[in-house]
Amino acid sequence: MPVACNVVTHGMRVTGVDSSPSLIALCRERLPDQEWIVADMRGFRHARTFDGIVAWDSYFHLGPDDQRSMFEVFAAHARHHTILMLNTGPAFGEAVGNYRGDPVYHASLDSNEYRGLLARYDFELIEHSIEDPQAGGRTVWLARGR
């Protein structure tokens, strides 16, 4: 939600996707003029492409195979110069963390594999920052569609 608020504050439109109906309901309440869709991002298909695609604090909750498959989803919704921004873990692995007392799954691929997926799906890497302190310690990927 904070990412969407920031985008809207800068005069842009948001199409938000989440598998949680209650989270989408909250988004519709707080930002009613935007498009909110209840869907699993792994199977998301929209009739149009976007100027920007952001998978922030969501993508790394997918398993390694689903993360690989998501690049097809990203590419299907990108066009020339679409910006793709996502965050991952710093290295290959899987872990179960804790958020407010609930277990939370995290997974990441190896940095070289992410680089390969970006290239394979025609994204040019602009910036990669591992455990970026300005992003709360997140590992950030910023790319552009070619």
Regions found by a protein language model. Name each.
Residues 68-80:
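A short glycine-rich, Lys/Arg-flanked "PGG" loop and its adjoining helix->strand segment in the class I
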Residues 1-43:
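Class I SAM-dependent methyltransferase SAM/SAH-binding core
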Residues 96-113:
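Acceptor-substrate binding/catalytic loop of class I
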Residues 89-94, 131-133:
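Short "lid" loop at the C-terminus of a central beta-strand within the Rossmann-like core
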Residues 81-88:
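Conserved beta-strand signature within the Rossmann-like core of class I S-adenosyl-L-methionine
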Residues 54-55:
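A conserved beta-strand element that flanks and buttresses the S-adenosyl-L-methionine
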Residues 129-146:
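Core SAM-dependent methyltransferase catalytic element
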Residues 61-62:
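A short His-aromatic
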